[in-house]
């Protein structure tokens, strides 16, 4: 691993700022933190819909917690594995990945993602992680054409699914819907990968890898998605070391902190915990889990807030300290050869918590109704803009659309870029202005998003 090649940026920079002694990864973190795309996460749905309650987490607070957990994982691994200090050379790098990991997710959570994927079904699809890659490398206006122009290693770390859409897509066996209201998310799952429109950037990121490493890293397999009964598409198999830490931090935050929101709001009950989670923890093959977590439900569902917070801290600490570094010696590049993984018994425990959130929170009819509503809003907006882009799109977006048309590129991607960047509230308001007679004649004039 030659650090210099992984610190390269796609567009060379010669900025000489007075007394600026920051590392390349500290600069990356600053660009992400100060970006408009990051700020908009404060008004995007995490699990519970924006506006339901002031307590729960948004995608912004979730990302901050993922960052805190990610650096905690790195600190633990530094102590456990001093021989891998070169791999764990920068906390700023891991903070960058964790802060940016959700930056491409559209309004209304999974509902918005499925809606955009359906509307883009003949134009390369849509998926939140692919959009994150695109925002960082192309869309965010830190530079004219290179997005935030982040370091190559940062871009490698954000690649949760390192293969293009065309390599992963498998056509599903379902009939074309005749009305948007009939769209079922289970029949239109997004392909987990990079958009083919961004293959040039993808190739640049992988440039330092040997041919063998590149081929294996981007290889695919048939596989199911944990949240879907039938996932028809192929799946990627590998991720980089940095990405593995970010993904574990994301999983822990999702399973533990989103569970906390659900408990506080009364969505998940103590009886559901004792039915769905407690037996797995009590019968765990790990002594610590049996001793420390078997009775943790009493604290989690306590009416005394400090006891619940203590239980949440115990859960997070348990998972963070159970992470180890595994090695796949087929890879030559250390960033691919090594991955952070959870010890098996803790992986089982984490999965049980994730399933609890999915079963009682995500699948809750009231939450699904919000997703469905968001789905309809996003499809309605896309259909309107696609019908007459030069009439309805904001002026700057019209210009991007025209350039795309003139260059023979995928102009529908411009529509997906615009809509996916909206917050829940902005998308809902725009939908009302377009389709509701009661919205009045005063259409909101706002600066380009």
Swiss-Prot record:
GO terms for biological process: dGTP catabolic process. NCBIfam families: antiphage_dGTPase, dGTP_triPase, PRK05318.1. The keyword Hydrolase applies. Residues 59-255 form the HD domain. Residues 1-27 are annotated as: Disordered. This is Deoxyguanosinetriphosphate triphosphohydrolase-like protein. Keywords: Hydrolase. Residues 7-27 have a biased composition (Basic and acidic residues). PROSITE patterns: HD. The keyword Disulfide bond does not apply. SMART domains: HDc. Gene3D superfamilies: Hypothetical protein af1432.
């Amino acid at each position: 691993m030659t650090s210099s090649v992984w610190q390269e940026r796609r567009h060379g920079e010669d900025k000489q700022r007075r007394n600026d002694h920051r590392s390349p990864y500290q600069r990356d973190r600053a660009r992400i933190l100060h970006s408009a795309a990051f700020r908009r996460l404060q008004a995007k749905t995490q699990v519970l819909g924006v506006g339901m309650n002031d307590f729960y987490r948004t995608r912004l607070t979730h990302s901050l917690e993922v960052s805190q957990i990610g650096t905690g994982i790195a600190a633990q691994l530094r102590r456990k594995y001093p021989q891998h200090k070169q791999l764990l050379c920068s906390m700023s790098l891991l903070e960058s990945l964790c802060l940016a990991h959700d930056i491409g997710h559209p309004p209304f959570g999974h509902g918005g993602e499925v809606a955009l994927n359906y509307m883009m079904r003949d134009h390369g699809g849509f998926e939140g992680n692919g959009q994150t890659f695109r925002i960082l490398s192309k869309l965010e206006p830190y530079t004219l054409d290179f997005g935030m122009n982040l370091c190559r290693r940062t871009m490698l770390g954000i690649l949760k699914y390192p293969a293009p859409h065309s390599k992963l897509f498998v056509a599903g066996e379902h009939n074309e819907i005749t009305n948007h209201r009939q769209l079922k998310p289970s029949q239109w799952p997004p392909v987990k990968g990079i958009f083919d429109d961004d293959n040039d950037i993808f190739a640049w990121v992988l440039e330092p890898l040997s041919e063998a490493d590149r081929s294996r890293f981007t290889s695919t397999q048939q596989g199911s998605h944990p949240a879907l009964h039938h996932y028809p598409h192929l799946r990627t198999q590998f991720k980089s070391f940095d990405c593995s830490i970010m993904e574990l931090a994301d999983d822990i935050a999702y399973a533990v902190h989103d569970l906390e929101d659900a408990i506080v709001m009364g969505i998940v009950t103590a009886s559901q915990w004792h039915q769905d989670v407690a037996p797995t923890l009590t019968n765990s093959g790990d002594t610590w889990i049996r001793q420390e977590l078997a009775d943790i439900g009493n604290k989690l569902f306590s009416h005394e807030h400090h006891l619940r917070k203590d239980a949440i801290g115990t859960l997070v600490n348990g998972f963070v300290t159970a992470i180890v570094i595994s090695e796949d010696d087929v890879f030559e590049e250390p960033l691919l050869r090594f991955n952070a993984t959870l010890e098996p018994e803790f992986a089982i425990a984490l999965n049980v918590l994730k399933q609890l959130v999915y079963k009682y929170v995500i699948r809750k009819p009231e939450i699904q109704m919000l997703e469905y509503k968001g789905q309809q809003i996003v499809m309605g907006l896309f259909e309107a803009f696609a019908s007459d882009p030069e009439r309805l799109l904001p002026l700057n977006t019209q210009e991007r659309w025209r350039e795309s048309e003139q260059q023979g590129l995928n102009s529908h991607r411009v529509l997906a870029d615009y809509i996916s960047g909206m917050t829940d509230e902005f998308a809902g308001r725009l939908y009302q202005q377009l389709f509701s007679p009661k919205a009045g004649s005063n259409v909101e004039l706002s600066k380009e998003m």
